[in-house]
Amino acid sequence: MRLLATALILTATSAWAATVPPREGPGENGSPAWFLQPSSTDPAGHTVVDAQGRITVHPHVAGDETFNGFRCTESTICQNRYGPSRLTLDRVQWKQTMGYTFEYPIRLPPGDGGPPAAGIDSKGNIWIYQRKAPGNPQLFKYSPDHKLILTVAESVIGHQDKPHGMAVDAQDNVWLCDINGSTVMKVSPDGKLLQTFGQKHHRGDWDEAKGQRLLWQPIAIAFAPNGDIYIGQGHGNESPNDVESDDPTNIMGAARVLQLDKNGTFIRQWFGHEAGQGKFDQIHGLAVDPKTGDIWIGDREQYRIQVHSGDGKFLKTILTRNLSSTLSFDNDGFPWMATGQDGQVLKLDRNGKVIGAIGNGMGIGHGQFIESAYFDFDKDGNIYVGDTSTGRVTKLVKPKK
């Protein structure tokens, strides 16, 4: 009888254990080991950063907003309001094996506001795009030795209502994506506004036949080797309810990729709102494969990357274990992915396998990110990473050979 009871207990214990997801796993098939780590509190940009990159969070004061956000309450495109909040999830972390170290050499101006994007020009200058309250500059240029050499005034580019992606083109022009402002702006190397796509605060559809050239939540931008411009649109889980709008210029209500030539002339666009292979709920990351010209789309809330050809044909889906927040290719042509609130930057192969990781997870400590965001590589392979929710830029220093 005692043996039977023991056997039943062991069987029940084994059955229970089989239903509990593992909290860690070994490295295999070229990927590092992984483990789960809890989430951290998001300070939403209300931080003070000292000269060592240490962060102090200060209380949020009502009315002290760094951008004018919209609330999503009704549309089917909103994030699932009945499931667990993303800020309560345990997060997959990958063991760091590549030997990168963390530095904080860029001193942003005092005050609130996270810098979601960093970009590097051909001369090694570092551009930083920051969320700030109206009346403050939001675009800064630093020399390769991290000295501030240019501040672009609000009088030039206007207030950027919710900065997201930024990219530097082959001529060292800087392109800015303001999702709530509904614009993409092209800024010269010396800080002059050259061109604006979209209409300020008029979210809508690009309809070339009507001469209607509006943007819908422009969030990320990338360039093909021939100079073609790809603008990713659709921060779906945070959209206002304009998909139920009566505005005849705004009827699609879906994430999309807009392709223009190097002069800004319309080529095509494709949408992600239908079910089936290659579709996407939102675009948070966007990158062009320099070897093939393929378009990599980070469909963040669905934990996947959708790969399309340069002319919009679906090629494959890559499922990820992390938020596919932002994407870029390094100097050797490898794809990398920042994992947002998972707090790392991952090196991938072209099948999406994780082959290396950098970052200590979600948080405000050394080597951590509240939300690792848009990033770029210098000529030595070091990586500059923006953080949407803390006022610092992290330099990931590549180990010397």
Residue ranges of predicted features:
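Sequence-structural signature of mature extracellular/luminal beta-sheet repeat domains
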Residues: 18-401
